[in-house]
């Protein structure tokens, strides 16, 4: 999950090579919204300057074009979710995506952890406790700032063996299909209840966990599988799979420009955090590898000298997790966005972060990665106007102008109303 050290940079499909840390990039952070509860992401509908904020506890809030945070939520689904733990929880309202034709059809999609029927309390919190659900809703015909919460159409439902490693970022690609990140099912080491004991869920192609999924929500009931998905027609393979070998893909995003690549940060076990560029049919290694290193699920801190990683793609970025070394960046990587805003020198840079260097205090980190040919170099981001930026970095957001935002919290769990969203601007 987290880390600080030198950086691994890699060509896609090749072994990563290490480089020394680059100098920090100076930025300023401007508060655009506050009084929030664990904001995880912020997205805008196509052609709309409003920004929609996902709060983990089950609400979507609107930040208007002129910067006003509306009191009344756009959507509140708390009664559909399992109750959340207040000190720390990976469940909740996790994702939001607007249909490419939102202006015409008013459709949008959310990802959340629903109650499993018959399990209404926290007494079964650790095993088969919730269903990761992606649902379609529509905006109210009478009020553009309110959703019609009564017309839920469930798209995908995946029962989850543990409370953690949910993933469930959702987003539409440039091809118009909906992509869904799915974690390995939780617990640790891709092992235990709900995991394939022989190879883990990440490498089990008959299983939905540990994958990137790709579906067509415009056809079928409740969806269709695109014919060009890489594993369509393969025996004993889930046809919705677009890519495999992921552990806990915590925040993905499509580049608004360039070649519209899909970036996913993947939280490591104990030692290494990584960022991948997701491609059709790609296998990103878990649990055969953690980052660029051969992984032993029985001895997770002792990496193997070799492994059968044929056909696997190494990350473009890797850094050390603070669980096992002080030469590290943090504990849990948080994926971000490629910058496409007004600052010319930042074009094409990937902004991301880490939740914190420690559980003991708020010590989130911000990073930026720059491509040079086939390799990427990572550097720290220095916040010059807030020298003591003490917050947990929960997520990032992006508006239709390409600006990137930071979701920052002062608590480890979804409680209170003290959290802020910052816009990253030039110093």
Role assignments for model-derived ranges:
Residues 230, 236-280:
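Acidic, glycine-rich loop-and-beta core segments that form the ion-binding/anion-interacting portion
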Residues 8-17:
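Bacterial N-terminal signal peptides
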Residues 62-64, 224, 273-277, 283-301, ...:
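Extended hydrophobic/aromatic segments used for targeting, binding, or gating
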Residues 264-269, 277-339, 343, 347, ...:
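Extracellular protease catalytic domains of secreted zymogens
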Residues 128-134, 192-214, 218-220, 276-298, ...:
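Predominantly five- to eight-bladed beta-propeller fold
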Residues 1-8:
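Bacterial N-terminal signal peptides that target proteins for export
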Residues 25-34, 68-87, 136-161, 191, ...:
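Blade-edge beta-strand/turn elements of extracellular beta-propeller
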Residues 23-187, 251-254, 260-271, 329-373, ...:
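Acidic, Gly/Ser/Thr-rich repeat motifs that build Ca2+-stabilized beta-propeller blades
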């Amino acid at each position: 999950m987290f880390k600080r050290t030198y950086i691994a940079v890699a060509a896609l499909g090749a072994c990563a090579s290490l480089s020394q840390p680059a100098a920090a990039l100076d930025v300023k952070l401007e508060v655009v919204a506050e009084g929030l509860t664990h904001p995880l992401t912020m997205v805008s509908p196509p052609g709309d300057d409003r920004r929609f904020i996902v709060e983990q506890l089950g609400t979507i809030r609107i930040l208007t074009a002129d910067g006003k945070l509306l009191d009344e939520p756009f959507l509140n689904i708390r009664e559909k979710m399992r109750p959340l733990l207040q000190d720390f929880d990976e469940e909740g309202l996790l994702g939001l995506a607007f249909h490419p034709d939102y202006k015409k059809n008013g459709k949008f999609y959310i990802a959340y952890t629903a109650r499993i029927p018959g399990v209404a309390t926290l007494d079964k919190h650790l095993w088969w406790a919730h269903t990761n659900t992606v649902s379609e809703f529509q905006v109210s015909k009478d009020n553009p700032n309110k959703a019609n919460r009564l017309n839920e159409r469930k798209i995908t439902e995946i029962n989850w063996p543990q409370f953690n490693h949910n993933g469930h970022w959702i987003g539409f690609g440039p091809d118009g299909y909906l992509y869904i990140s799915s974690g390995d099912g939780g617990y640790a080491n891709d092992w235990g209840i709900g995991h394939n004991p022989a190879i883990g869920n990440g490498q089990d192609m008959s299983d939905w966990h540990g994958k990137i999924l790709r579906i067509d929500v415009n056809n079928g009931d409740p969806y269709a599988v695109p014919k060009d998905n890489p594993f369509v027609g393969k025996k004993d393979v889930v046809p919705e799979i677009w890519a495999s070998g992921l552990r806990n893909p915590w925040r993905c995003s499509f580049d608004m420009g360039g070649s519209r690549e899909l970036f996913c940060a993947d939280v490591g076990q104990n030692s290494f955090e990584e960022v991948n560029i997701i491609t059709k049919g790609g296998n990103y290694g878990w649990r055969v590898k953690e980052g660029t290193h051969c992984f032993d699920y029985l001895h997770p801190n002792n990496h193997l000298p070799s492994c059968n990683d044929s056909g696997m793609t190494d990350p473009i970025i890797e850094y050390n997790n603070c669980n096992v070394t002080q030469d590290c960046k943090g504990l849990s990587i948080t994926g971000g966005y490629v910058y496409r805003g007004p600052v010319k020198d930042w074009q094409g840079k990937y902004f991301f972060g880490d939740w914190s260097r420690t559980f003991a205090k708020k010590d989130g980190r911000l990073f930026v990665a720059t491509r040079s040919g086939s390799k990427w170099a990572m550097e720290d981001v220095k916040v010059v106007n807030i020298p003591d930026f003490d917050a947990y970095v929960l997520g990032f957001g992006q508006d239709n102008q390409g600006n990137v935002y930071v979701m920052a919290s002062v608590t480890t769990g979804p409680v209170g109303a003290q959290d802020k969203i910052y816009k990253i601007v030039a110093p």
